[in-house]
Protein backbone atom coordinates (compact mmCIF):
# COMPACT_ATOMS: atom_id res chain seq x y z
CA UNK A 1 0.00 0.00 0.00
CA UNK A 2 1.30 3.47 -0.91
CA UNK A 3 2.36 5.63 2.03
CA UNK A 4 0.58 8.83 1.04
CA UNK A 5 2.57 11.03 3.42
CA UNK A 6 5.91 9.95 1.94
CA UNK A 7 4.93 9.52 -1.72
CA UNK A 8 6.00 12.72 -3.48
CA UNK A 9 4.22 13.75 -6.68
CA UNK A 10 6.59 14.26 -9.58
CA UNK A 11 4.05 14.40 -12.42
CA UNK A 12 0.34 14.49 -13.21
CA UNK A 13 0.34 10.79 -14.12
CA UNK A 14 0.56 9.98 -10.41
CA UNK A 15 -2.55 12.05 -9.73
CA UNK A 16 -4.44 10.30 -12.52
CA UNK A 17 -3.33 6.99 -11.04
CA UNK A 18 -4.68 8.10 -7.65
CA UNK A 19 -8.18 8.28 -9.15
CA UNK A 20 -7.67 5.08 -11.13
CA UNK A 21 -6.82 3.35 -7.86
CA UNK A 22 -10.36 4.21 -6.74
CA UNK A 23 -11.96 2.15 -9.54
CA UNK A 24 -14.04 -0.76 -8.22
CA UNK A 25 -15.50 -3.88 -9.79
CA UNK A 26 -19.24 -3.95 -10.47
CA UNK A 27 -19.58 -6.55 -7.73
CA UNK A 28 -17.77 -4.40 -5.14
CA UNK A 29 -19.82 -1.19 -5.23
CA UNK A 30 -20.52 0.32 -1.81
CA UNK A 31 -22.54 3.19 -0.35
CA UNK A 32 -21.18 5.42 2.39
CA UNK A 33 -23.25 8.03 4.21
CA UNK A 34 -22.10 10.96 6.32
CA UNK A 35 -24.74 12.65 8.43
CA UNK A 36 -24.50 15.87 10.46
CA UNK A 37 -26.66 16.96 13.40
CA UNK A 38 -26.90 20.10 15.52
CA UNK A 39 -26.55 19.67 19.27
CA UNK A 40 -28.10 22.25 21.61
CA UNK A 41 -28.36 22.92 25.33
CA UNK A 42 -31.86 21.91 26.39
CA UNK A 43 -32.38 24.93 28.62
CA UNK A 44 -31.56 27.83 26.30
CA UNK A 45 -31.04 26.23 22.84
CA UNK A 46 -27.51 27.61 22.63
CA UNK A 47 -25.07 25.46 20.69
CA UNK A 48 -22.81 23.16 22.67
CA UNK A 49 -19.15 23.99 23.32
CA UNK A 50 -15.92 21.99 23.37
CA UNK A 51 -16.25 20.86 26.99
CA UNK A 52 -19.69 19.43 26.24
CA UNK A 53 -18.65 17.56 23.10
CA UNK A 54 -15.64 16.26 24.99
CA UNK A 55 -17.98 14.88 27.66
CA UNK A 56 -20.01 13.11 24.97
CA UNK A 57 -16.83 11.65 23.50
CA UNK A 58 -15.63 10.49 26.92
CA UNK A 59 -18.90 8.59 27.47
CA UNK A 60 -18.75 7.05 23.99
CA UNK A 61 -15.16 5.92 24.62
CA UNK A 62 -16.62 3.51 27.16
CA UNK A 63 -18.66 1.95 24.33
CA UNK A 64 -15.64 0.93 22.27
CA UNK A 65 -14.89 4.17 20.44
CA UNK A 66 -11.20 5.05 20.15
CA UNK A 67 -10.12 8.67 20.79
CA UNK A 68 -8.64 10.82 18.03
CA UNK A 69 -6.38 13.60 19.31
CA UNK A 70 -4.90 16.84 17.97
CA UNK A 71 -2.23 18.33 20.25
CA UNK A 72 -3.65 16.37 23.20
CA UNK A 73 -7.18 17.66 22.52
CA UNK A 74 -9.89 15.05 21.98
CA UNK A 75 -11.36 16.00 18.59
CA UNK A 76 -13.04 12.81 17.37
CA UNK A 77 -13.63 9.09 17.73
CA UNK A 78 -13.15 6.01 15.60
CA UNK A 79 -14.59 2.50 15.73
CA UNK A 80 -13.68 0.08 12.94
CA UNK A 81 -14.76 1.87 9.72
CA UNK A 82 -16.90 4.47 11.48
CA UNK A 83 -15.74 7.94 12.48
CA UNK A 84 -17.27 10.64 14.65
CA UNK A 85 -16.04 14.18 14.10
CA UNK A 86 -17.32 17.68 14.69
CA UNK A 87 -17.61 20.55 12.25
CA UNK A 88 -16.46 24.14 12.96
CA UNK A 89 -19.50 24.95 15.15
CA UNK A 90 -19.51 21.48 16.79
CA UNK A 91 -22.07 20.05 14.40
CA UNK A 92 -21.91 16.33 15.19
CA UNK A 93 -21.00 14.11 12.23
CA UNK A 94 -21.14 10.35 11.86
CA UNK A 95 -19.10 9.15 8.88
CA UNK A 96 -20.43 5.67 8.35
CA UNK A 97 -18.71 2.61 7.02
CA UNK A 98 -19.20 1.76 3.33
CA UNK A 99 -21.90 -0.87 2.87
CA UNK A 100 -23.30 -2.91 0.01
CA UNK A 101 -26.92 -1.86 0.57
CA UNK A 102 -29.15 0.75 2.19
CA UNK A 103 -30.43 -1.72 4.80
CA UNK A 104 -26.96 -1.82 6.35
CA UNK A 105 -26.49 1.94 6.03
CA UNK A 106 -29.79 2.58 7.80
CA UNK A 107 -29.13 0.00 10.47
CA UNK A 108 -25.76 1.59 11.25
CA UNK A 109 -27.31 5.04 11.64
CA UNK A 110 -30.09 3.66 13.81
CA UNK A 111 -27.67 1.85 16.07
CA UNK A 112 -25.41 4.85 16.54
CA UNK A 113 -28.10 7.43 17.14
CA UNK A 114 -29.74 5.19 19.73
CA UNK A 115 -26.29 5.00 21.32
CA UNK A 116 -26.11 8.80 21.25
CA UNK A 117 -29.62 9.12 22.66
CA UNK A 118 -28.51 7.13 25.72
CA UNK A 119 -25.61 9.55 26.17
CA UNK A 120 -27.99 12.52 26.12
CA UNK A 121 -29.86 11.14 29.14
CA UNK A 122 -26.92 12.06 31.37
CA UNK A 123 -26.38 15.49 29.80
CA UNK A 124 -28.28 18.73 29.20
CA UNK A 125 -28.04 18.22 25.44
CA UNK A 126 -30.68 17.71 22.76
CA UNK A 127 -30.80 17.69 18.96
CA UNK A 128 -32.65 19.27 16.09
CA UNK A 129 -32.82 17.50 12.75
CA UNK A 130 -32.79 20.62 10.63
CA UNK A 131 -30.18 21.74 8.13
CA UNK A 132 -29.60 25.35 9.21
CA UNK A 133 -29.36 26.50 12.83
CA UNK A 134 -32.70 28.26 13.33
CA UNK A 135 -31.96 29.74 16.75
CA UNK A 136 -28.46 31.19 17.08
CA UNK A 137 -26.58 34.12 15.63
CA UNK A 138 -23.30 33.32 13.92
CA UNK A 139 -21.37 35.38 16.47
CA UNK A 140 -22.82 33.37 19.38
CA UNK A 141 -21.69 29.93 18.19
CA UNK A 142 -18.70 28.38 20.02
CA UNK A 143 -15.70 27.68 17.81
CA UNK A 144 -14.11 24.26 17.38
CA UNK A 145 -10.40 24.40 18.42
CA UNK A 146 -9.18 22.33 15.44
CA UNK A 147 -6.34 24.25 13.83
CA UNK A 148 -7.67 23.78 10.31
CA UNK A 149 -10.97 25.41 11.29
CA UNK A 150 -9.18 28.43 12.76
CA UNK A 151 -7.43 28.91 9.42
CA UNK A 152 -10.65 28.37 7.46
CA UNK A 153 -12.49 30.92 9.62
CA UNK A 154 -9.94 33.52 8.56
CA UNK A 155 -9.59 32.47 4.91
CA UNK A 156 -13.03 31.35 3.73
CA UNK A 157 -14.83 34.73 3.85
CA UNK A 158 -12.36 36.10 1.30
CA UNK A 159 -14.19 34.32 -1.50
CA UNK A 160 -17.83 33.94 -0.42
CA UNK A 161 -19.97 36.18 1.77
CA UNK A 162 -21.84 33.30 3.45
CA UNK A 163 -18.79 31.06 3.95
CA UNK A 164 -18.86 31.35 7.74
CA UNK A 165 -22.58 30.55 7.80
CA UNK A 166 -21.71 27.41 5.83
CA UNK A 167 -19.04 26.44 8.34
CA UNK A 168 -20.93 27.13 11.55
CA UNK A 169 -24.65 27.03 10.80
CA UNK A 170 -25.31 24.25 8.26
CA UNK A 171 -25.78 20.49 8.55
CA UNK A 172 -26.07 18.12 5.61
CA UNK A 173 -26.08 14.55 4.40
CA UNK A 174 -23.35 13.32 2.06
CA UNK A 175 -23.58 10.10 0.04
CA UNK A 176 -20.43 8.46 -1.31
CA UNK A 177 -20.55 6.25 -4.40
CA UNK A 178 -17.95 4.12 -6.14
CA UNK A 179 -17.09 4.25 -9.83
CA UNK A 180 -16.08 1.39 -12.14
CA UNK A 181 -14.22 3.33 -14.84
CA UNK A 182 -13.44 6.84 -16.04
CA UNK A 183 -16.57 6.81 -18.21
CA UNK A 184 -18.66 5.59 -15.28
CA UNK A 185 -17.26 8.41 -13.13
CA UNK A 186 -18.26 10.97 -15.77
CA UNK A 187 -21.86 9.73 -15.92
CA UNK A 188 -22.30 9.65 -12.14
CA UNK A 189 -20.60 13.03 -11.71
CA UNK A 190 -22.87 14.64 -14.30
CA UNK A 191 -26.01 13.04 -12.86
CA UNK A 192 -25.18 14.32 -9.38
CA UNK A 193 -24.54 17.85 -10.62
CA UNK A 194 -27.40 18.07 -13.11
CA UNK A 195 -29.81 16.82 -10.44
CA UNK A 196 -28.48 19.21 -7.78
CA UNK A 197 -31.52 21.52 -8.23
CA UNK A 198 -33.85 18.56 -7.66
CA UNK A 199 -31.82 17.39 -4.67
CA UNK A 200 -31.94 20.81 -3.03
CA UNK A 201 -35.70 21.10 -3.62
CA UNK A 202 -36.72 17.56 -2.73
CA UNK A 203 -34.76 17.46 0.53
CA UNK A 204 -35.31 21.12 1.53
CA UNK A 205 -35.35 21.28 5.32
CA UNK A 206 -33.95 24.64 6.40
CA UNK A 207 -36.49 27.49 6.15
CA UNK A 208 -35.54 29.39 9.33
CA UNK A 209 -32.80 31.77 10.46
CA UNK A 210 -32.53 33.47 13.86
CA UNK A 211 -36.01 32.40 15.00
CA UNK A 212 -37.88 33.59 11.92
CA UNK A 213 -38.55 32.65 8.32
CA UNK A 214 -35.53 33.05 6.05
CA UNK A 215 -37.50 33.39 2.82
CA UNK A 216 -35.99 30.14 1.54
CA UNK A 217 -37.06 26.49 1.74
CA UNK A 218 -33.42 25.42 1.83
CA UNK A 219 -31.46 28.26 3.34
CA UNK A 220 -28.62 25.80 3.67
CA UNK A 221 -28.73 25.38 -0.12
CA UNK A 222 -28.60 29.16 -0.57
CA UNK A 223 -25.66 29.48 1.83
CA UNK A 224 -23.65 26.81 0.03
CA UNK A 225 -24.20 28.64 -3.25
CA UNK A 226 -22.51 31.71 -1.75
CA UNK A 227 -19.60 29.87 -0.22
CA UNK A 228 -15.95 30.15 -1.17
CA UNK A 229 -14.96 27.14 -3.33
CA UNK A 230 -18.61 26.02 -3.57
CA UNK A 231 -21.29 25.68 -6.26
CA UNK A 232 -21.28 23.49 -9.37
CA UNK A 233 -17.93 23.02 -11.11
CA UNK A 234 -17.78 24.61 -14.56
CA UNK A 235 -16.23 21.43 -16.00
CA UNK A 236 -19.47 19.59 -15.24
CA UNK A 237 -20.86 20.75 -18.57
CA UNK A 238 -17.86 19.57 -20.62
CA UNK A 239 -16.53 16.13 -21.44
CA UNK A 240 -14.82 15.08 -18.22
CA UNK A 241 -12.12 12.60 -17.33
CA UNK A 242 -9.73 12.26 -14.40
CA UNK A 243 -7.15 14.55 -15.99
CA UNK A 244 -9.66 17.34 -16.56
CA UNK A 245 -10.87 17.06 -12.96
CA UNK A 246 -7.26 17.26 -11.78
CA UNK A 247 -6.51 20.30 -13.94
CA UNK A 248 -9.54 22.02 -12.42
CA UNK A 249 -8.80 20.99 -8.83
CA UNK A 250 -5.14 22.04 -8.81
CA UNK A 251 -6.11 25.57 -9.86
CA UNK A 252 -7.84 26.14 -6.51
CA UNK A 253 -5.73 28.06 -3.99
CA UNK A 254 -4.42 25.86 -1.19
CA UNK A 255 -6.53 26.58 1.89
CA UNK A 256 -4.03 25.18 4.37
CA UNK A 257 -1.06 22.85 4.38
CA UNK A 258 0.20 20.71 7.24
CA UNK A 259 3.95 20.09 7.27
CA UNK A 260 6.00 18.69 10.15
CA UNK A 261 3.02 18.99 12.47
CA UNK A 262 2.47 22.68 11.69
CA UNK A 263 -0.28 24.31 9.62
CA UNK A 264 0.60 26.88 6.95
CA UNK A 265 -1.53 29.26 4.86
CA UNK A 266 -0.06 29.63 1.36
CA UNK A 267 -1.77 33.03 0.81
CA UNK A 268 -3.50 32.38 -2.48
CA UNK A 269 -0.92 30.08 -4.04
CA UNK A 270 -2.51 27.17 -5.88
CA UNK A 271 -1.88 23.46 -5.76
CA UNK A 272 -0.49 23.82 -9.28
CA UNK A 273 2.15 26.15 -7.81
CA UNK A 274 2.97 23.45 -5.28
CA UNK A 275 3.27 20.81 -8.02
CA UNK A 276 5.77 23.06 -9.77
CA UNK A 277 7.81 23.46 -6.58
CA UNK A 278 6.95 27.15 -6.35
CA UNK A 279 5.44 27.54 -2.88
CA UNK A 280 7.06 30.58 -1.29
CA UNK A 281 7.71 28.90 2.07
CA UNK A 282 8.62 25.45 0.67
CA UNK A 283 10.71 26.44 -2.33
CA UNK A 284 11.53 23.44 -4.49
CA UNK A 285 9.49 20.98 -2.40
CA UNK A 286 6.84 18.85 -4.13
CA UNK A 287 3.51 17.76 -2.61
CA UNK A 288 2.73 14.27 -1.38
CA UNK A 289 -0.37 12.25 -2.21
CA UNK A 290 -1.57 13.09 1.30
CA UNK A 291 -1.26 16.80 0.47
CA UNK A 292 -3.31 16.23 -2.69
CA UNK A 293 -5.98 14.27 -0.85
CA UNK A 294 -6.25 17.00 1.80
CA UNK A 295 -6.56 19.62 -0.94
CA UNK A 296 -9.41 17.70 -2.61
CA UNK A 297 -11.26 17.81 0.72
CA UNK A 298 -11.15 21.62 0.77
CA UNK A 299 -13.15 21.93 -2.46
CA UNK A 300 -16.73 22.46 -1.32
CA UNK A 301 -18.71 21.93 -4.52
CA UNK A 302 -22.07 20.14 -4.73
CA UNK A 303 -20.40 17.03 -6.17
CA UNK A 304 -16.79 16.18 -5.44
CA UNK A 305 -14.35 13.47 -6.47
CA UNK A 306 -11.85 11.76 -4.21
CA UNK A 307 -11.57 7.99 -4.62
CA UNK A 308 -15.35 8.01 -4.36
CA UNK A 309 -17.90 10.41 -5.84
CA UNK A 310 -19.45 12.53 -3.11
CA UNK A 311 -23.06 13.77 -3.43
CA UNK A 312 -23.30 16.78 -1.10
CA UNK A 313 -26.51 18.72 -1.88
CA UNK A 314 -28.89 17.21 0.68
CA UNK A 315 -30.22 19.04 3.72
CA UNK A 316 -29.97 16.94 6.83
CA UNK A 317 -33.29 15.68 8.20
CA UNK A 318 -34.81 13.55 10.94
CA UNK A 319 -34.06 9.86 11.23
CA UNK A 320 -37.20 8.84 9.36
CA UNK A 321 -35.88 10.44 6.18
CA UNK A 322 -32.10 9.97 6.51
CA UNK A 323 -32.25 6.81 4.40
CA UNK A 324 -34.43 8.40 1.70
CA UNK A 325 -31.71 10.30 -0.12
CA UNK A 326 -29.26 7.40 -0.19
CA UNK A 327 -31.96 4.99 -1.39
CA UNK A 328 -33.21 7.44 -4.05
CA UNK A 329 -29.76 8.04 -5.52
CA UNK A 330 -28.66 4.42 -5.17
CA UNK A 331 -31.58 3.42 -7.38
CA UNK A 332 -30.49 6.00 -9.97
CA UNK A 333 -26.71 5.57 -9.72
CA UNK A 334 -26.29 1.85 -9.11
CA UNK A 335 -29.61 0.50 -10.38
CA UNK A 336 -30.61 2.65 -13.38
CA UNK A 337 -27.48 4.54 -14.40
CA UNK A 338 -27.95 4.39 -18.17
CA UNK A 339 -31.63 5.36 -18.12
CA UNK A 340 -30.90 8.26 -15.77
CA UNK A 341 -27.96 9.47 -17.83
CA UNK A 342 -29.92 9.32 -21.09
CA UNK A 343 -32.43 11.79 -19.65
CA UNK A 344 -29.95 14.37 -18.37
CA UNK A 345 -27.04 14.11 -20.80
CA UNK A 346 -28.22 16.84 -23.19
CA UNK A 347 -29.40 19.32 -20.58
CA UNK A 348 -27.89 22.75 -21.15
CA UNK A 349 -25.63 24.51 -18.67
CA UNK A 350 -27.83 27.62 -18.58
CA UNK A 351 -30.96 25.58 -17.78
CA UNK A 352 -29.30 23.61 -14.99
CA UNK A 353 -27.64 26.65 -13.43
CA UNK A 354 -30.82 28.72 -13.47
CA UNK A 355 -32.73 25.90 -11.77
CA UNK A 356 -29.87 25.41 -9.31
CA UNK A 357 -29.95 29.06 -8.24
CA UNK A 358 -33.77 29.11 -7.99
CA UNK A 359 -34.25 25.81 -6.14
CA UNK A 360 -33.43 26.97 -2.57
CA UNK A 361 -36.28 29.51 -2.71
CA UNK A 362 -38.77 28.03 -5.19
CA UNK A 363 -38.35 24.39 -4.21
CA UNK A 364 -40.30 21.89 -6.30
CA UNK A 365 -41.95 24.72 -8.26
CA UNK A 366 -38.60 25.50 -9.87
CA UNK A 367 -38.57 25.06 -13.64
CA UNK A 368 -36.00 22.90 -15.39
CA UNK A 369 -36.40 22.11 -19.09
CA UNK A 370 -39.96 23.49 -19.02
CA UNK A 371 -40.96 21.05 -16.29
CA UNK A 372 -41.41 21.79 -12.61
CA UNK A 373 -39.02 19.91 -10.35
CA UNK A 374 -41.96 18.08 -8.77
CA UNK A 375 -42.63 16.52 -12.18
CA UNK A 376 -38.97 15.57 -12.50
CA UNK A 377 -39.19 14.12 -8.99
CA UNK A 378 -41.99 11.79 -10.12
CA UNK A 379 -39.98 10.70 -13.16
CA UNK A 380 -36.78 10.01 -11.26
CA UNK A 381 -38.60 8.37 -8.35
CA UNK A 382 -40.06 5.82 -10.77
CA UNK A 383 -36.62 5.24 -12.29
CA UNK A 384 -35.08 4.88 -8.84
CA UNK A 385 -37.71 2.32 -7.83
CA UNK A 386 -36.94 0.29 -10.95
CA UNK A 387 -33.25 0.47 -10.13
CA UNK A 388 -33.77 -0.67 -6.55
CA UNK A 389 -36.06 -3.48 -7.71
CA UNK A 390 -33.35 -4.53 -10.15
CA UNK A 391 -30.73 -4.52 -7.38
CA UNK A 392 -33.06 -6.67 -5.26
CA UNK A 393 -31.09 -6.18 -2.05
CA UNK A 394 -33.32 -7.79 0.58
CA UNK A 395 -33.48 -7.34 4.34
CA UNK A 396 -34.32 -10.05 6.86
CA UNK A 397 -38.01 -9.59 6.13
CA UNK A 398 -37.50 -10.09 2.40
CA UNK A 399 -38.11 -6.42 1.52
CA UNK A 400 -35.91 -4.50 -0.90
CA UNK A 401 -34.51 -0.97 -0.63
CA UNK A 402 -37.65 0.72 -2.02
CA UNK A 403 -39.04 0.68 1.55
CA UNK A 404 -36.89 3.75 2.29
CA UNK A 405 -38.52 5.93 -0.38
CA UNK A 406 -41.61 6.62 1.71
CA UNK A 407 -40.54 10.17 2.65
CA UNK A 408 -40.10 11.15 -1.01
CA UNK A 409 -43.40 9.51 -1.98
CA UNK A 410 -45.18 11.58 0.69
CA UNK A 411 -43.56 14.81 -0.50
CA UNK A 412 -44.66 14.16 -4.07
CA UNK A 413 -48.14 13.04 -3.04
CA UNK A 414 -48.68 16.09 -0.78
CA UNK A 415 -46.82 18.46 -3.12
CA UNK A 416 -45.06 19.80 -0.02
CA UNK A 417 -41.44 19.56 1.02
CA UNK A 418 -40.49 19.04 4.64
CA UNK A 419 -39.56 22.74 4.75
CA UNK A 420 -43.06 23.77 3.69
CA UNK A 421 -44.60 21.57 6.38
CA UNK A 422 -42.31 23.17 8.97
CA UNK A 423 -43.36 26.63 7.79
CA UNK A 424 -47.03 25.66 8.23
CA UNK A 425 -46.31 24.60 11.81
CA UNK A 426 -44.42 27.81 12.50
CA UNK A 427 -47.23 29.98 11.15
CA UNK A 428 -49.65 28.56 13.73
CA UNK A 429 -47.71 29.87 16.76
CA UNK A 430 -44.73 31.86 15.41
CA UNK A 431 -42.55 29.68 17.65
CA UNK A 432 -39.89 27.08 16.78
CA UNK A 433 -39.95 24.85 19.85
CA UNK A 434 -41.39 22.01 17.74
CA UNK A 435 -37.99 21.70 16.01
CA UNK A 436 -36.33 20.19 19.05
CA UNK A 437 -36.14 16.40 18.88
CA UNK A 438 -36.13 15.42 22.56
CA UNK A 439 -37.71 12.07 21.76
CA UNK A 440 -36.76 11.45 18.15
CA UNK A 441 -37.32 7.81 17.23
CA UNK A 442 -34.14 6.20 15.91
CA UNK A 443 -35.70 2.77 15.40
CA UNK A 444 -34.54 0.96 12.30
CA UNK A 445 -37.63 0.07 10.27
CA UNK A 446 -35.95 -2.26 7.82
CA UNK A 447 -36.03 -5.53 9.73
Residue ranges, per PLM feature:
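Terminal catalytic/cofactor-binding subdomain
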Residues: 1-161, 169, 204, 321, ...
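Structured core elements
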Residues: 38, 174-176, 310-312
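Short glycine-centered, acidic/aromatic-flanked micro-motifs in structured strand/loop junctions
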Residues: 96, 177-179, 313
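Conserved phosphate-binding loops in nucleotide/dinucleotide-binding enzymes
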Residues: 104, 180, 184, 314-322
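Loop-rich catalytic cores of soluble enzymes, especially ATP-dependent carboxylate-amine ligases
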Residues: 121, 127-128, 132-304
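C-terminal, helix-dominated tail/subdomain
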Residues: 223, 228-252, 352-415
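Long, well-ordered mid-to-C-terminal structural blocks that present hydrophobic/aromatic surfaces
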Residues: 270-352
Amino acid sequence: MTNKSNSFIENKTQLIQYFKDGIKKDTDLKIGVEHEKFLFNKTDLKRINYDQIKKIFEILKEKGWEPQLEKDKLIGLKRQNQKITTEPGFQYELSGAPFKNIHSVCSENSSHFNELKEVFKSTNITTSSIAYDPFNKLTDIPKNPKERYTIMTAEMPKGGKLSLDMMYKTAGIQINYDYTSEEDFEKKFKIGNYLAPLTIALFANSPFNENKLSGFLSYRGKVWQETNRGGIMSITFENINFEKYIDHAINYPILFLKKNGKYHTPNGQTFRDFLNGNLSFLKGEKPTLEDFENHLGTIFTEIRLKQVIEFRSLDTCNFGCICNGPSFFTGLIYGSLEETYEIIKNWKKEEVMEAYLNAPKQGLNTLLQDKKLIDWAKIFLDISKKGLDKRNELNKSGKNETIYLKHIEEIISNKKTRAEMLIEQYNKTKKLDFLINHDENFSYSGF
